[in-house]
Amino acid sequence: MKDKIKKLYGKLRKVQQEVNYEGDFQTWDEAKKRCEGYDSDAIFQKVTNAAMQVKEGKALFDRDSVLFYEEEWNYPLIAWFQRIAAKYDQRLTILDLGGAFGSTYFQNRAFLKNSIRQMQWIIREQEHFVEFGKQNLADPELIFEYDFEKIAEA
């Protein structure tokens, strides 16, 4: 499994090196200052508030800060996870790129815990999301990491 993650890491680094920008800006930082995205403070505050409500048991899961109070299993995803786990002695490691604060993990974990013996859900996100997740949401199954090399070692 570690070899597969290292191979994926290599491919992602290559794609990252090929990323460029166009426009009337001299630098990436100059362009970034003129736009707002998912890393804005307002969005971060909203999604962290929702994530903490899930952690505190006030909601079952959230999706982009929208709270859900009833179970909504993602059956196609669960079926694939179970199929993969069946090949690996009911053990499953998931690398969730852009997984926010584990919304898909929280949505499906109760179902998966009944059928998968050992699960590790690794979320790779923006650095400030990872830091918040490590400090407030991580547990033995749910891991937050920014560095692909550390992910490959997990």
Model-derived regions, located:
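Generic alpha-helical secondary structure signal
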Residues: 3, 75, 127-131
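Class I SAM-dependent methyltransferase Rossmann-like catalytic core
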Residues: 34-90
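Charged/polar, solvent-exposed surface patches and flexible loops
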Residues: 7, 30, 49, 79, ...
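Membrane-proximal basic amphipathic "stem/tether" segments
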Residues: 1-37
